[in-house]
Amino acid sequence: MNSIEFPLFERTAQNSVISTTSNDLSNWSRLSSLWPLLYGTSCCFIEFASLIGSRFDFDRYGLVPRSSPRQADLILTAGTVTMKMAPSLVRLYEQMPEPKYVIAMGACTITGGMFSTDSYSTVRGVDKLIPVDVYLPGCPPKPEAVIDAITKLRKRVSRETYEDRIGSQQENRCFTTNHKFHVGRSTHTGNYDQGLLYQSPYKPSEIFFRYKSSVSSHELVN
């Protein structure tokens, strides 16, 4: 499960020459040094916390949880993301140094889950805010699934090129309170338009009473 396709070198050869590229050397050095920023807002985060114990021992993958986004290169989102928390999540992502990666953990993070059907304040997928590298479905995903997602991410890092990193930094997208895409300034440069996430606290009730008044009285009689 933890194997990455890289050539093994002969330890007995004393006068050997190793040739590689700077891109491959950079990828190899980052394989076992992913430092995640834990962003847990719901019950899925409890499953990730089980990896800290001795049974799964996620330290063997080089994962060192960080409390500051400036020291992390991986953010693991677990749980429901609301419109109120969306600016904070985007800002944390912006403060992470390049290259950086995102793992979306759980159904609520990927699609909004059961809260996305009738909730006006739930983001229907964290990929509407930040680019996601690995999707981890489940409600909640098991610790073994988290390990599998990290393994797949490490395999992607091993095949990454410099052009892929530049392309991921040029995406311009964000998500409004009406659950619509907005194409404008890049959300990864600190110029995120906070006004797109503003919603009047009286708007939901106004819509409700407007709908209630439009329904005739005979339709409410059984």
Curated annotation (Swiss-Prot):
InterPro entries: NADH_UbQ_OxRdtase-like_20kDa (IPR006137), NADH_UQ_OxRdtase_20Kd_su (IPR006138). GO terms for cellular component: chloroplast thylakoid membrane; respiratory chain complex I. Coiled coil: none annotated. Pfam families: Oxidored_q6 (PF01058). It catalyses: a plastoquinone + NADH + (n+1) H(+)(in) = a plastoquinol + NAD(+) + n H(+)(out); a plastoquinone + NADPH + (n+1) H(+)(in) = a plastoquinol + NADP(+) + n H(+)(out). One of its GO terms (biological process) is photosynthesis, light reaction. The keyword Thylakoid applies. It is found in: Plastid, Chloroplast thylakoid membrane. This is NAD(P)H-quinone oxidoreductase subunit K, chloroplastic. It comes from Chloranthus spicatus (Chulantree).
